[in-house]
């Protein structure tokens, strides 16, 4: 891998000499095994020209067996129809696809997009959240587009093994032009049991909060969080003229 995309991404440069999908990846262990977790994979897709490509984050258990994968793929070399796929694997390695979301048509004509894919497991409930940005028109990532969420229940508890290892992987299809897809980041968090009566922490020290009045969006660390806003539902419909935003507690946030 080499640093690419204006110093933000990491690009695969050497691919195996084989047929079909060929790729390169890097793997590392987590500081500790995680029972409940939230894992987000962030990638950039160069889709100005047509081509086939895929990139994914793989999650392994303590025995090194594949537990889950979250990834983005454009499998048709002559079309720009990408989709996000989440797959779980049982102890035997049998795959179970629980999410397959195809880009909305508004994404087809964009030259460069940033894709976020999040998989969260708490108990036997898996939550998936995906969103994207137009990296050309919105380089600061203030206006999330093509957002989607889904929940899936592991009724048989076949996918409850602790997560211990992660890997980032990028691939192209041998014989066809590569639609370049590069990883931008992997964010892996253990979810600890919440004490009784405790509230979820939405904003923490160091978080970057962006409120866009024109786009009517609230983004925290590039994640759409409008559903978590505590201000009135008519906040974005204030008449033109003087308005004031009050942030509490005072002297805490750097604005």
Go through each PLM region and give its residues.
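Broad, structure-driven detector of short, well-ordered beta-strand segments within folded domains
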Residues: 66-81, 115-121, 164-169, 209-212
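Extracellular/lumenal carbohydrate-interaction signature centered on repeated Trp-anchored short motifs
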Residues: 27-39, 105-113, 237
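C-terminal interaction-tip segments
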Residues: 251-255
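Carbohydrate-binding surfaces in secreted/extracellular proteins
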Residues: 39-41, 107-156, 217-220
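Surface-exposed loop/edge segments in extracytoplasmic proteins
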Residues: 65-69, 95-97, 135-149, 225-227
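Secretory/extracellular carbohydrate-interaction modules
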Residues: 1-95
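Ligand-recognition surfaces built from glycine- and aromatic
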Residues: 1-22, 32, 47, 145-216, ...
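Short, aromatic/His-centered strand-loop micro-motif at the edge of beta-sheets
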Residues: 84-118
